[in-house]
Amino acid sequence: LDAKSFYLVDSGGQYYEGTTDITRTIALGELTAEEKEHFTLVLISMLRLQAVRFLYGCRGLSLDYVAREPFWSRGLNFDHGTGHGVGYLSSVHERPNGIRFKMVPERCDNGILEEGMITSDEPGLYIEGKHGIRTENLILCKKDEKNEYGQFLRFEYLTYVPIDLEVIDREIMSERDVEL
């Protein structure tokens, strides 16, 4: 590997305790300002989705904008779903939960997000001929506050693998993004 740009590792495994799916992007040397910006946008996207609260009855289509807004506000996008359901000793891509901005009927992944569902949170950015970046954690859907508006849910992250902090461009992060 050359000491430049990024190395993207997408890995996982099947265990009696569950199925894992993770992606990390690692810097292999000095990066350009654009590479640092893109790495940071991917991280912001993942963190914002991981921190969202939502009412029961919500589907991934309703949450996808939270993850894509950092890209769309800059005229950027990634051409894959933001997340997919993760099975237990079955398929790493499992129905019925998923997070994407448009319907893909053959995926059958537009189910209501339920307590106990595990979903990947994996935004990315791919610039043809330059670099590809993705950061993926698994998130668990959990009950949160219940009030007069209904039952709120939230995500708890399940992935504890470090992220390359030296690559982050804090100048483009809001105070809230840094806190996440």
Indicate where each model-derived feature is located.
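Active-site neighborhoods and metal-handling regions in enzymes and metal-associated proteins
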Residues: L1-L180
